[in-house]
């Protein structure tokens, strides 16, 4: 994926020394994951926020996967960013096969990893043609399972089910993303702080949500 090489070139050109803790949301999580496999010596911690998962395709299976790709192609909109009108967009699933090949040959090395997953269901069109026949009851457990599988990529990864957030967890509950990043950075600097964690993202005096929640039935 070209954007991974571009990010690497940008960090080098900007003289930002590694190694890095990467944080990525949605497709940005895919970029972070592929960066870590492409440049394994440069990444020592990651936070993936409701990220595109390498497990989506096998979990959705041969019947559902093409429907998911078509659904996202029809529903995705690109919001222009001032000054970046010519920026390229990444078609959904365009790098999936390459990603799974890369991650299979270059697994994620052990590191502090925090995985955040949305809890509020996506708003699906009521028109079955537009939704590709998906319902929240069908799709949400699969998305949850794909997110949860990311927390099994390395030993001692932390998983958090953000029940009060939609896909944009960093906007709906920004403190969760901030705390996850803080915990990963602290874990890189002092590994004992990571292994001693009893929860991801929540501070010691705030346990209103259960970090080990099983989420939707699946």
Enumerate the language-model features and the residues they cover:
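Active-site nucleophile elbow and catalytic-triad environment of alpha/beta-hydrolase enzymes
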Residues: 84-105, 140-149
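Catalytic active-site module of serine/aspartate enzymes centered on a nucleophile-bearing elbow/loop
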Residues: 155-218
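Conserved acidic catalytic loop of the alpha/beta-hydrolase fold
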Residues: 2-18
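Short beta-strand/loop motif that positions the catalytic acidic residue
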Residues: 115-117
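Flexible "cap/lid" loop of the alpha/beta hydrolase fold
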Residues: 47-91, 95, 130
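Conserved hydrolase catalytic core segment
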Residues: 17-60
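Short, hydrophobic alpha-helix immediately C-terminal to the catalytic nucleophile
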Residues: 8, 33-37, 178
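Conserved loop-alpha-helix segment in the C-terminal half of the alpha/beta-hydrolase fold
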Residues: 123, 127-165
């Amino acid at each position: 994926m070209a954007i991974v090489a571009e990010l690497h070139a940008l960090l080098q050109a900007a003289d930002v020394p590694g190694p890095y803790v990467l944080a990525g949301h949605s497709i940005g999580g895919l970029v972070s994951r592929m960066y870590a496999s492409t440049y394994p010596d440069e990444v020592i911690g990651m936070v993936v926020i409701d990220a595109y998962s390498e497990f989506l395709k096998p979990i959705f299976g041969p019947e559902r996967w093409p429907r998911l790709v078509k659904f996202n192609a029809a529903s995705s909109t690109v919001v222009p960013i001032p000054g970046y009108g010519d920026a390229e967009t990444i078609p959904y699933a365009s790098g999936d096969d390459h990603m799974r090949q890369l991650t299979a040959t270059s697994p994620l090395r052990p590191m502090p990893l925090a995985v955040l997953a949305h809890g509020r269901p996506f708003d699906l069109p009521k028109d079955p043609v537009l939704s590709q026949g998906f319902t929240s009851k069908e799709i949400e457990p699969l998305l949850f399972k794909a997110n949860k599988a990311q927390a099994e990529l390395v030993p001692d990864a932390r998983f958090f089910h953000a029940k009060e957030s939609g896909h944009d967890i960093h906007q709906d509950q920004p403190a969760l993303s901030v705390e996850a990043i803080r915990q990963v950075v602290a874990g890189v600097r002092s590994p004992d702080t990571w292994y001693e964690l009893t929860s991801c993202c929540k501070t010691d005096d705030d346990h209103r949500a259960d970090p080990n929640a099983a989420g939707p039935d699946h």
